[in-house]
């Protein structure tokens, strides 16, 4: 049973997440030859103040 963890910054719509999990599930089932029902996806959303790149918080880079 494949279990995928996806970490995203907050701000995606439910529709975008639906499309993402559908496409990721299709990619996994096609690659690993397993049924859709076996695929699990966990989406974790981060606040901008909890993510940094090059020493700068995302909240400070608008």
Model segments located where?
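A domain-level signal for the structural core that forms small-molecule/cofactor-binding pockets
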Residues: 2-62
């Amino acid at each position: 049973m494949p279990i995928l963890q996806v970490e995203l910054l907050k701000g995606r719509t439910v529709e975008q997440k639906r499309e993402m999990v559908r496409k990721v599930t299709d990619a996994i089932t096609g690659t690993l030859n397993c049924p859709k029902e076996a695929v699990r996806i966990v989406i974790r959303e981060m606040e901008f103040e909890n993510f940094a790149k090059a020493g700068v918080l995302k909240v400070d880079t608008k």
